[in-house]
Each structure stands twice: as structure tokens, then as C-alpha cells.
Amino acid sequence: MKNMDIEALKSEINRIILERKDRYIRFLSELLRFRTVSASSSGRERAEAPDEFRKAFSFMEDEARRLGLEFRNHKGMAAVIEWKAAESGDEDDEVGIACHIDVVPAGKGWNYPPFGGTVADGCIWGRGTQDDKGPIGSIMA
């Protein structure tokens, strides 16, 4: 790629990011509110986890379908969100991105509620923001 092409590509990517920023913030803030605590947790969080995963998958499915994406839920344990970009049928045209929505227990010391999806101080705060709900939000935006 020529330097000019790279700069044009960067400019287009920045334009798309800014165009979709509010949608990303809304989606991620909502996704962070689901207490999708991993099976290694105990007590109340473990008891509530199956219902929270169902709700999170339902939310993700609604959003995927709104965006014209295909959503397949695999027994509440995994989901595939697919965009059919090419009709060639060639598997080499496909790209897969693996992400997860389970998080470890929040622990203490949070400045904002760990399952609040709070937008403050120029950040989105919540358990899973970096690992791995944030990347899911960027894909879905």
C-alpha cells in the first residue's frame, strides 16, 4: 500500500469509529450489567449465573439481528455471531474472532459498581470491560 492509501484508510477507520462511538458505548454499558460470573465463583453469583448468561445472550442476539447478523446460541454455553460478507462459499473468505462473556468475581475496591456499565471520567467502568466484553462491543458496533 502506498503511504497515501494508508493515510486514507486511517482516516476512514477514524470516521467509522466516531460515527459508531455512541452505539458502542450503549452496547458495552448494557453488556457489562449482566453478572456473567464464571463457574468458578461461589454463592449467590454462581446461583444467578445461568440466568445472567441467558439474558446476556438474548441481549446479544437482539443486537446482532438488529444489525442484520446471524446469531446461533449453542445451549447457552457459546454463541456464533456471523456476518456473511462473501457469497463465494470459500472458507478462506471467513474470519473468526473468539471472545467470551464470562468474568471472574469482582472483588472489592471498585470506584464504580462492577456490574454498572458506568460511563465516567472518559471511560466505561465494569467487570469485563477489557476482558472480554469490550472487544465484543467493538465487534458489534
Regions found by a protein language model. Give the residues of each.
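Acidic/histidine-rich catalytic neighborhood of metal-dependent amide-processing enzymes
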Residues: 132-141
